[in-house]
Amino acid sequence: MYENKQERKPTLKIGNATFITSAATEKQFITPDKPVIAVCGKSNVGKSSFINMLANQKKLAKTSSAPGRTRLVNYFDFGAFILADLPGYGFAQVSKTEKAKWAKTLDAFFRDKEKITHVFMLADCRHDPTVDDVQMIEYLHFHVIPFTVVLTKGDKLSKMKLKEHKRAIANDLYLTENNLLATSSETGYGKDDVLLRIEELLQRANEEIGD
């Protein structure tokens, strides 16, 4: 739908990505043997569709029209890295007890930040960042956890509108546009940009191991 300005094509190939396990508590978190990239975002932002797009699969991560379905940390093996799908936040129709439980799980996951290579924080490109989005970014900044904001559902806006909204969101969140990627799981738009970012992250992680 849109022209991709990124001329360089990713060399990273996602083969047969597979589900590893789900974790409901900190004790169930896995001990990774490769870089971990986490995916977080507001409920119903399109995390499952984003993961399936990267994996070239339709049903690796279960999608649902009902927000709040991801209540566990779901781990997937993507070959060169492990992807951790985190519980969605900001779902209004969940009890305070359940929200507190999710928050505790997220906090426990991020507390062990040495095991986290990067975080992709997803946000709907059609809407302004929510209070929950801002709080998540502030949390990542405070704990010095590297992240990239990934805008989802890019096919829902025209090329011009997407460009304008991307710039506005970057300003609202005090981010450089380089730290903001736009995607569409429907069309595959932006997928190469995400894979290129992952390549850079993995290369950096391997260099740090070498040092």
Where are these regions (language model features)?
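Glycine-rich, phosphate-binding/catalytic loops in enzymes
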Residues: 36, 56-57, 99-102, 136-140, ...
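Conserved nucleotide-binding/hydrolysis micro-motifs of P-loop NTPases
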Residues: 24, 69, 81, 88-90, ...
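Switch II of P-loop NTPase G domains
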Residues: 29, 65-74, 87-117, 125-139
